[in-house]
Amino acid sequence: MKEKFELVSAYDPAGDQPNAINEITKKVLAGQRHQTLLGATGTGKTFTMSNVVKEINRPTLVIAHNKTLAGQLYSEFKEFFPNNAVEYFVSYYDYYQPEAYVPSTDTFIEKDASINDEIDKLRHSATSALFERQDVLIVASVSCIYGLGNPEEYKSQVLSLRMGMEKDRDQLLRDLVEVQYARNDINFQRGTFRVRGDSVEIIPASHEEYCIRVEFFGDEIDRIREVDALTGEIIGDREHVAIFPASHFVTREEKMKIAIQNIEKELEEQLKEMRDNGKLLEAQRLEQRTNYDLEMMREMGFCSGIENYSRHLTLRGPGAVPYTLLDFFPEDFLVIIDESHVTLPQIRGMFNGDQARKQVLVDHGFRLPSAMDNRPLRFQEFEDKTKQLVYVSATPGPYELEHSPEMTEQIIRPTGLLDPKVEVRPIEGQIDNLIEEIRIRMEKNERVLITTLTKKMSEDLTDYLKEIGMKVAYLHSEIKTLERIEVIRDLRVGKFDVLVGINLLREGLDIPEVSLVSILDADKEGFLRSERSLIQTMGRAARNENGKVIMYADKMTDSMKKAIDETNRRRTIQTEYNEQHGITPKTIRKEVRDVIKATTAAEETESYEPKTKQINKMTKKEREKVIEQMENEMKQAAKDLDFEKAAELRDVILELKAEG
């Protein structure tokens, strides 16, 4: 029987959510290829999409434009679908420095990466879930368009073990090694197996909490048990178990032999061409590097950077489309693209950036030309591999507008909150006028965001406001992650009343205490004053019942007019709905989350103090202790699936290491 998505939620769809759910569901079931959910900030878009997934009941891929957002979505979907396979698939590098070559200085930068074991486990959990069940929802970052092994090869190498099956114990051990499990009787961890008399214990690549114990009687599997990997407690008996490969790049021995021959052939041709063109140094470099890799592949079955030979390992021709996570899904899967106005351009840009870097490596003898085929998908290829897409955004981009002119709107917030009122005021006397407005907000214990166009303007304004005794902070691009989190927290708890910045579009700035957003130089056309950016910036005041936006401008630009008209249109719809249903808007009360405990010193002080200053005074030894403590906290956060906290910690650790 086909498993069903089971939505668990304390509340029912409200406002225009029911209409949006019905409309999108109907269009998907009718086979419409593209559609867009135009959802204003704070209208519960994730809840709407969860309802659509439940109604359609197909495997679903949700793509977000960065790990933090993917982590937030993953947590939300997991809450809505606790009994289904909600998975997380992002790049497993904690940090990643791709190999590169700078010809001008003759500098080769080796690939340097730290792989997060927890995320690697979740990636395996995602791919294996797709082969085991139907009710799968995977939240991914754009890394899902990067090369992965051949899904057919991956599937064909799954070890299927049943009770009563005839199988020789030693044959099982050989099979496990072939799918890249390592025997380790001492350090028993994910992706390893150990042998104890007549039983073999395996920890699958997609889990580490439990291991599978296969007990033999002669040449027959007598019993299969699930055992707690830590305590050895028996969880239960299994009739059947599927052991998925420990790597996504699995290649059978016979295929590996053909691949090695093809690599040798390509190497020969490339060396000849290089020598004919007088590139002797490059030829020597290429020969040495490739032969070393080939030797490793013959002996070990893999080498460092094996993904650069993926075209040969999957026996594809030059220029062929790489296999990606999309190929692991069944034919009828649904794709949801979150914040599509940012995510789609990102997908479009991946291929060109990757090729430019690799071309330099090939030209200078660091890689064979076939390495160019270990690449992300081109946008056209991405379109070919996806059959039905739903774009979700408060400000859809040109691609969405072109492909789905009839959008599904979701404008009413379940809280009854309205889009802010918008006023345009002249630039002359803007600062005095702004100060008056700030004072009104301070009396009501509300906060103000001010966005300027230049760094100098931000600094001057911050200094001036400080001089006249206002509590103000300046959020600029050089500010470190930890400080940024602290500044936002300080604004919320009232340490500051005003926050000045240039780009207020980054995540984390949805602050319910903010009742005024002031946009200086609103009539200067450009990226941060485009229609889309203005609507997003204005949305920062939409979480407060007294939300208001003041634009300072001497003329009305086209972008301003469109943004104001759209906001007023939404506000009218929201007001009418509230009047009809007797709803009074109420500001969202959101608790102030504690900043990550960065230092033991900070934990001991009851009053809230900026931790960064304390860190600066530390000795090297104390700093190392803090980093170690934070790394443990980061790993724990990743284990608890709080990826937002883990990402914040990771950034802070990198900054501390750089300063140390």
UniProtKB/Swiss-Prot annotation:
What is the source species?
Answer: Oceanobacillus iheyensis (strain DSM 14371 / CIP 107618 / JCM 11309 / KCTC 3954 / HTE831)
Q: Which gene encodes it?
A: uvrB
* UniProt-listed SUPFAM superfamilies: C-terminal UvrC-binding domain of UvrB, P-loop containing nucleoside triphosphate hydrolases
User: Per the UniProt entry, what is one GO biological process?
Assistant: SOS response
Looking at the record, the residues that make up the UVR domain are 624-659
An annotated Gene Ontology molecular function: ATP binding
List where in the cell it is found: Cytoplasm
Location of motif Beta-hairpin in this chain is 92-115
Residues annotated as binding ATP:
39-46
- Quote the subunit structure annotation: Forms a heterotetramer with UvrA during the search for lesions. Interacts with UvrC in an incision complex.
> Does this UniProt record's set of keywords contain Ribosomal protein?
no
Protein role: The UvrABC repair system catalyzes the recognition and processing of DNA lesions. A damage recognition complex composed of 2 UvrA and 2 UvrB subunits scans DNA for abnormalities. Upon binding of the UvrA(2)B(2) complex to a putative damaged site, the DNA wraps around one UvrB monomer. DNA wrap is dependent on ATP binding by UvrB and probably causes local melting of the DNA helix, facilitating insertion of UvrB beta-hairpin between the DNA strands. Then UvrB probes one DNA strand for the presence of a lesion.
Has UniProt tagged this entry with the keyword Protease? Answer: no
Give a GO cellular-component term: cytoplasm
Where would I find the Helicase C-terminal domain in this sequence? 430-596
Sorted alphabetically, which Pfam families does this protein's record hold?
Helicase_C (PF00271), ResIII (PF04851), UVR (PF02151), UvrB (PF12344), UvrB_inter (PF17757)
Q: What's written under domain?
A: The beta-hairpin motif is involved in DNA binding.
Q: Can you give the residue ranges of the Helicase ATP-binding domain?
A: 26-414
Descriptive protein name: UvrABC system protein B
**Which family is this protein grouped under?**
Belongs to the UvrB family.
Q: Which UniProt keywords apply?
A: ATP-binding, Cytoplasm, DNA damage, DNA excision, DNA repair, Excision nuclease, Nucleotide-binding, SOS response
Q: Where are the transmembrane segments?
A: none
